[in-house]
């Protein structure tokens, strides 16, 4: 991929295709002034989704350990660039795409970035750890 915009666009297409393939209606806002990338219609309730590209991180053996994405948006003004966290009144979920699946993470579970573990930490800590498998789109949607 040549640049981050193309990478982001590909992630958006992958998430949209995945969610549409599950049978859900998707609406895309006109322009790029909205904080969300799509509206997902689930049982006549609308959810604002912000799609983020996630990066994979590997352990010393080269095995996938976790994925991470930013939970902020960047804007530019006369002072330079600033990063701002998304708020619960702006979006409902972040979506990301990894290894052939779409994942949905509630905005209230995110701060500046979100780490989703693929395998447990070496110390086997579970408290305060988010596991990728807990955010598979179908599973999250089934609980709505």
Name what the model sees in each region:
Residues 52-103:
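Catalytic cores of nucleic-acid endonucleases
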